[in-house]
Amino acid sequence: MSPAWLRPRLRFCLFLLLLLLVPAARGCGPGRVVGSRRRPPRKLVPLAYKQFSPNVPEKTLGASGRYEGKIARSSERFKELTPNYNPDIIFKDEENTGADRLMTQRCKDRLNSLAISVMNQWPGVKLRVTEGWDEDGHHSEESLHYEGRAVDITTSDRDRNKYGLLARLAVEAGFDWVYYESKAHVHCSVKSEHSAAAKTGGCFPAGAQVRLENGERVALSAVKPGDRVLAMGEDGTPTFSDVLIFLDREPNRLRAFQVIETQDPPRRLALTPAHLLFIADNHTEPAAHFRATFASHVQPGQYVLVSGVPGLQPARVAAVSTHVALGSYAPLTRHGTLVVEDVVASCFAAVADHHLAQLAFWPLRLFPSLAWGSWTPSEGVHWYPQMLYRLGRLLLEESTFHPLGMSGAGS
């Protein structure tokens, strides 16, 4: 058995070994490497009866989010529902109204993905939906069935011995909350289609400003890879750092942001809840000793680092609130930090360890072609952090991750 202090290092060595294989995997596409053995598929662990995943209540931010109100055929929100005519899914449709086929696009996407998994897992068996959108009031108050955000499912052969594994397949398909609710079915639900919580990860608003090396202040939406922006070095001093890539860039997406406001000096920074921010519990802590924590964990009375004259200085958090804004940008600098709206932040999100994240991105600093390859998207989440996030889920403890996970990573 390895000593406790060594285990994280061993995990990280596995990280680095796998990262070395990334250029070939991305450059050559799918295919078997000569002389390699096929790895057996990852063993899926069925959910136990009455188990739910994630292990939080359904209508919380870390799962499917709050109830937003019943949708009737006559309501304005009815247009949010779309029919699902997938021939690989059997809809029970007891009401003979087609209601069970109606659902949000997010729910439809997850359900279609699950249908493929079911056929692959059990040849000749299809996914069966016993309940989708409910307009008749047959469920409990504030049920997500009333919004088309929930489905109850079985397999077409109604073999109850399959339902635990069916629930696990639903988790893998990307449903935001899965509950092995009954011996007769599995309950699955998703976040609201227009809720900013349906997309998370680590970003700043499009209009958030950074300082370039020439002294100019520009919005993140105008920053380009190769620009040098104000950041913080390992020793806690201000420095200018190269922008390598955008980990996420979505100019037309509504996002929920955590707003951190300070006093003396007054600053206001908006960033997504899963993003890392440097904090301390008192103002005497040296800048290099400020610790990284998720923005959603920051409390009034704690201290963040802000740019001042000279250098960086602590500022007391006066208020924390939430705000929804259009557009989100997440640049990665060579130092792994940046100063946004005069507040020092990490470039990383979703995982609680800033230093581990910085180490995991070393290939992008050593091999620029990884950042600039033809597979780099102009919008959306860059493939590299998505790959790291999925890999980290296999190697690191669950407590290492923010419950909201990462945008576009299937979490």
UniProtKB/Swiss-Prot annotation:
Give Gene Ontology CC terms. endoplasmic reticulum membrane; extracellular matrix; extracellular region; Golgi membrane; plasma membrane
Concerning Gene3D superfamilies, the annotation shows: 3.30.1380.10, Hedgehog/Intein (Hint) domain
Expression by tissue: In the adult kidney, found in proximal convoluted and proximal straight tubule. Expressed in the developing eye.
Protein's UniProt keywords contain Nucleotidyltransferase: no
List site positions: Involved in cholesterol transfer.
Answer: D248
Record-listed Ca(2+) 1 binding positions? E94, E95, D100, T130, E131
Chain positions recorded as Zn(2+) binding sites = H145, D152, H187
- The signal peptide stretch is 1-27
Q: Where is this site: Cleavage?
A: G202, C203
Which E.C. number(s) belong to this protein?
3.1.-.-
Q: Which GO terms describe its biological process?
A: bone resorption; branching involved in blood vessel morphogenesis; camera-type eye development; camera-type eye photoreceptor cell fate commitment; cartilage development; cell fate specification; cell maturation; cell population proliferation
Give the residues carrying a lipid (N-palmitoyl cysteine): C28
For the lipid attachment Cholesterol glycine ester, which residues are annotated? Answer: G202
Query: Which Gene Ontology terms cover its molecular function?
Result: calcium ion binding; cholesterol-protein transferase activity; patched binding; peptidase activity; very-low-density lipoprotein particle binding
Tell me which PROSITE patterns the record gives: INTEIN_N_TER (PS50817)
Task: Specify the domain of life of the species encoding this protein.
Answer: Eukaryota
* Keywords carried by this UniProt record: Autocatalytic cleavage, Calcium, Cell membrane, Developmental protein, Endoplasmic reticulum, Glycoprotein, Golgi apparatus, Hydrolase, Lipoprotein, Membrane, Metal-binding, Palmitate, Protease, Secreted, Signal, Transferase, Zinc
Q: What does the UniProt entry report for the null mutant?
A: Almost half of homozygous embryos mice for IHH died between 10.5 and 12.5 dpc. Also some lethality occurred in late gestation, most of the remaining embryos developed to term but died at birth, due to respiratory failure. Mutants display markedly reduced chondrocyte proliferation, maturation of chondrocytes at inappropriate position, and a failure of osteoblast development in endochondral bones.
Q: What does this protein do?
A: Plays a role in embryonic morphogenesis; it is involved in the regulation of endochondral skeleton formation, and the development of retinal pigment epithelium (RPE), photoreceptors and periocular tissues.
Q: Which family does it belong to?
A: Belongs to the hedgehog family.
Question: What is this protein's name?
Answer: Indian hedgehog protein
